[in-house]
């Protein structure tokens, strides 16, 4: 057997729980279909899901889940169904439906710790170990992502504070932004070619004024000789 019962009895006065112990799928199904409470407990606080999982009755676990059994239910020791099972298919079913592999009971024991203590088969142990390792890696990735997000937020906050503490920087950014907006509106209103023609005319007028004032034609041969 790949499981060890924990101070268990093979008899109970509750029909559904007895069906879960015996692995009687058809009887359990009839009881559930006639309205039996899927979360009914025994004197140790264990539900049918606990008892079916402990014996590897995964089909009964599925039916209990289908009829509303609480997968997160714990017994009076804080054990989930996953703490009591030692079968690969039952472990896979419970984990795939939301049970956490690293959840601890009232004594701080995880399903893996109890499985090793009970001496379940090696395949179940390896599965639990692999699932715990995945959980740890996922937690580390999540923590790293949160740390990066916090660092980015702090950096943005520092930049904003620097901008607020430096009014000259803030004013210059505002002036540049205003100038860009005004220039874009100006170009859109006149049209690109008209603006280009206007700039050419302004440039020619500037050259004419320079010649009138200095008497020297800009970019003339004499100016180039002086430069050399």
From Swiss-Prot:
ANK repeats lie at residues 11-40, 44-73, 77-103, 107-138. It is a single-pass membrane protein. Keywords: ANK repeat, Membrane, Repeat, Transmembrane, Transmembrane helix. InterPro entries: Ankyrin_rpt, Ankyrin_rpt-contain_sf. GO terms for cellular component: membrane. SMART domains: ANK. The chain crosses the membrane at residues 195-215. This is Ankyrin repeat domain-containing protein 46. It comes from Danio rerio.
